[in-house]
From Swiss-Prot:
Localization per record: Cell inner membrane
Name this polypeptide is given: Na(+)-translocating NADH-quinone reductase subunit B
Lineage of the organism: Bacteria, Pseudomonadati, Pseudomonadota, Gammaproteobacteria, Pasteurellales
GO cellular component terms, A-Z: plasma membrane
Domain of life: Bacteria
Pfam families from the UniProt entry: NQR2_RnfD_RnfE (PF03116)
Length: 410
């Protein structure tokens, strides 16, 4: 008997009145991940598409894999480089289970480590964070689905990996669990669940950590997974000393634009490589999951605002001089632009609204980065701010169309 036949034989027991009725949500989620649902349209439908929401979310999830794998490689590489510089490898193996496990399975943790060893060490940091977020957030998804008696939506595949990619590799697991809980319960389920949340759940979870536990989500101690190592992000370095201050904290070598573009710098796990994020973005834009209008709007808004600050200039604030192409590759700008600003639920729906929504994100990101003396990153707050304005943009566009048609018909 094939697996599909086994599922079909078991299915009646999970429907209403069946022995396992209360577990239908879990049965349906498992079946529809493996196979296309057997449901058919009984009445007129507004949209027909071969790509259902389940496949769409899984495709976005897969599109984040390039950034995820590079993030693991970079985390491991930065950690090995730092421990080699500090001469603390022996202490790290003795006191840090990530290093001890990696060495036990054959990884080389010295300066001549290969890509496999770097990937393995990075995976020991990323995978526990991701699994914690996935399991805790998934638990809340299942609880609310069972209480409301509806299907489990695969949107959490995307939320979980995004949240795991926008945090430092040293984040405590209990804080990852709290972030997942806040993102799923407070930012999504409280407002009715999938399709009804007005803000991005992953960003809401990170914002919760930023305001509740700033020491573990910002500063100089959290970006490199090496005990006792301190190193500022490239954005913080620019804020303190301008472009000339962009130096690798370990080697002292200059950080070039290409280093930042490829992702050879410390930072949140999945936001460092603009190249890998572009590869994933090409997939979801080509599949028409992400709106190119939003991406273009963000880019135009950022470039225009950065250029304006360049023209104004400042002798005391060195971020005024940062060109737009540096804004693109530093911090969380690329990840936010490609995968968070384009969230179809919390973004604007109308075509014109998408342009204004994207432009607002680009403008606010640069304004927060440059004009905020306490925190040189602005993409998270910019997107959450724009989420609040997305319905307003759509309303104004619709009202404008109504007025234009009335005037034309008069």
């Amino acid at each position: 008997m094939g697996l599909k036949n086994l599922f079909e034989k078991m299915e009646p027991a999970f429907h209403k009145g069946g022995k396992y009725e209360k577990w239908y949500t879990l049965f349906e989620a498992t079946y529809t991940i493996l196979y296309t649902p057997g449901t058919v349209t009984k009445k007129d439908s507004h949209v027909r598409d071969a790509l259902d929401s389940k496949r769409m979310m899984i495709l976005v999830w897969l599109a984040l894999f390039p950034a995820m794998f590079w993030g693991m490689y970079n985390v491991g590489g930065q950690a090995i480089l730092a421990t080699s510089h500090l001469g603390s490898l022996t202490d790290s193996i003795a006191n840090n289970w990530h290093y001890a496990f990696s060495e036990a399975v054959g990884a080389t943790l010295t300066a001549d480590a290969g890509w496999g060893s770097k990937m393995l060490l990075g995976a020991t940091y990323f995978l526990p964070i991701y699994l914690t977020i996935f399991l805790v957030g998934g638990f809340w998804e299942v609880v609310f689905a069972m209480v409301r008696k509806h299907e489990i939506n695969e949107g959490f595949f995307v939320t979980s990996i995004l949240l795991a990619l926008i945090v430092p590799p040293t984040l405590p697991l209990w804080q990852a669990a709290l972030a997942a809980t806040f993102g799923v319960v407070v930012a999504k389920e409280v407002f009715g669940g999938v399709g009804k949340n007005f803000m991005n759940p992953a960003l809401a979870g990170r914002a919760f950590l930023f305001f509740a536990y700033p020491a573990q989500i910002s500063g100089d101690l959290v970006w490199t997974a090496a005990d006792g190592f301190s190193g500022a992000t490239a954005l913080s370095q620019w804020a303190q000393g301008g472009q000339i201050a962009l130096k690798h904290a370990v080697t002292g070598q200059e950080i070039t634009w290409m280093d930042a573009f490829l992702g050879n710098i410390p930072g949140s796990i999945g936001e460092v490589s603009t190249l890998m994020l572009m590869i994933g973005a090409a997939i979801i834009v080509f599949a028409r999951i992400a709106s190119w209008r939003i991406i273009a709007g963000v880019l135009v808004g950022m470039a225009a605002t950065a250029t304006l600050f360049n023209l104004i200039g400042s002798e005391t604030n060195l971020l005024f001089a940062m060109p737009w192409y540096w804004h693109l590759v530093l911090g969380g700008f690329a990840l936010g632009m490609f995968f968070m600003a384009t969230d179809p639920v919390s973004a604007s729906f109308t075509n014109k609204g998408k342009w204004w929504y994207g432009a607002l994100i680009g403008v606010m990101c640069v304004v927060i980065r440059v004009a905020n003396p306490a925190y040189p990153e602005g993409m998270m707050l910019a997107i959450l701010f724009a989420n609040l304005f997305a319905p307003i943009f759509d309303y104004l566009v619709v009202q404008s169309n109504i007025k234009r048609r009335k005037a034309k018909a008069a």
